[in-house]
Amino acid sequence: MLTAQRSRIRCREITGPAHSVALKARPPLSRDIDDIFVRRRKQEATRGEVLEFTKDQSSCDVRMRWERNTQRRVVSATVNRHLQDALDQYQMGIDEKRERLRELLESEELELFKEMEAKKETVLERQAKMHERAKTLRERRESERQRVVADKLDQLFREQSEELRAVQIKRRQDQVCTERESQIRTKEEVRRVQEEEEKLFAQMWESDRLAKEERHNLELQRQRENNLQQKAVLQTQMDMAEQQRIQAKELKQEEAQLLKDQREMLRLEAEREHRQKLQDQEKRRKQLDLSLRLKMKRLTRDRQEELALDMSILEQLLAQEKDEKQDEVLKKLERQEEQRRYREYLSQQLEEQKRLEAETEQLFESELQQAWARREAQWRLEKTARDRLMKDVMDTLRLQIQEKLNENMQKQAEAFKEKEELDRIIQANKLLDEEEKAHFREATKEYQADLLAQMMYRQRIREAEEAEKEYEFQKGLMYEEQYNKKIQDILSRPISSTTAVHPFRRRDRRCSSSGGQMS
């Protein structure tokens, strides 16, 4: 605070343009005290407002906190109540289930006890069953022993009988030859079936390839026809667009010419009105000039007549005076009296003449005014007729121009609509073209994928056939080797009744049995 006061004291010094320093006047102390008091009052008022606002804010915060806590407690109580109700219902459901299960368990236990009571056996019955079971086991064991003894005796007989061994060997050789022939015949049949299948697959492949090539060619032909048709349609649309552009240009030129004609008509109408106004002003000026000239002519004529009359009177008087110089003096007075009376009479006549001329002038003016009024009325009627005719002509011309403008605007609107329709058709054709191209690309991809799948399928079939042939060949070699080993083994050991049947013989037996069942 002191530093600020010192800075304010230093700031009282002001340097002038020369090497001199001036001091500002010190403000009065009363103003500072009043300012301090006012500032302090303002600060106290502001502090009071802040304290009041803080108190209100704190009370609002307390109230809001209490309301939030109350709302939270209410919500918590509601949730707890709903939860307790749900738990009570769940507990009631569990209790009911427990009661039902307990009743079901009791009923099942009772049924089980009843069944056990019903199935309870005595000791004598159990001993009788055990003796029966032991007897059955002894009989089964004795029958198995007898069958084994019979097999051993039969095997011993076959081993000791040379004739039986020779017959069996001969029979087995015949059977092996028959089975070999059957195997060869089966291989031939399998090879024939495979060849027929290959031919069938080749025919199907060729027919499918030809059909797909035909479809592809038809699709290409249809695509070319569609392209040519779309090209023709686009050319037609371009020609129509060019015609519409030329028509729109002509319509704009016609509209510009119509607007120019309308402006020229307005200019001519304004020029006609201006010329009519000038003509009216000229007519009015001519009327005023004519009336002024007539009035000036009349005044000039009156003055000339008065001057001529005065000159004639003076000449007569002078002549009479010259003649009367020789008369008597008495007659002079009489003549003067007569001259006075004559002058009075002349003045009266002059006044009467002026009055008559005034009346004549007035009549002339009235007749002239009537004539001018009639002429003006006639001119007004003619002007009204001309104006009406000109107005009709202008209205007709304006109506024609407006009709042409409306027709031009309608043509432009129709041309715009046709252009929009043409643009829409072009866009639709473009979309159709894109869809057809996409469909063609998709069909081409599907065709390629189909061809590739068929090639892979044929390759897999060929590989599977080759693998199956190789497997059959290896299997045949293995069977032949096993067969030879088995022949050698059979020839080298005694013949038994438990000899395994060859797979081909077993297959032939199964085929013959199935054929018999089918028949």
From Swiss-Prot:
Effects seen without this gene: Embryos display total organ heterotaxia. At 48 hours post-fertizilation, pericardial edema is observed and heart looping is reversed or heart fails to loop. Morpholino knockdown in the embryo results in minor defects in the motility of pronephric cilia while the majority of cilia of the spinal canal and Kuppfer's vesicle are barely motile. Reduced number of outer dynein arms in Kuppfer's vesicle cilia.
Primary site of residence: cytoplasm
Region (Disordered): 498-519
One GO CC term, this protein: extracellular region
Lineage top rank: taxon: Eukaryota
InterPro entries, sorted: CFAP53/TCHP (IPR043596), TPH_dom (IPR043597)
Subcellular location as annotated: Cytoplasm, Cytoskeleton, Cilium axoneme; Cytoplasm, Cytoskeleton, Cilium basal body
Coiled-coil ranges (or none): 80-107, 210-339
Protein keywords: Cell projection, Cilium, Cilium biogenesis/degradation, Coiled coil, Cytoplasm, Cytoskeleton, Developmental protein
Disulfide bond positions: none
Gene Ontology BP terms: cilium assembly; cilium movement; determination of left/right symmetry; epithelial cilium movement involved in determination of left/right asymmetry
Similarity section: Belongs to the CFAP53 family.
Role summary: Microtubule inner protein (MIP) part of the dynein-decorated doublet microtubules (DMTs) in cilia axoneme, which is required for motile cilia beating. Regulates motility patterns of both 9+0 and 9+2 motile cilia through differential localization and recruitment of axonemal dynein components. Required for cilium motility within the spinal canal and Kuppfer's vesicle and is involved in the establishment of left-right symmetry during embryogenesis.
Protein name: Cilia- and flagella-associated protein 53
Organism of this sequence: Danio rerio
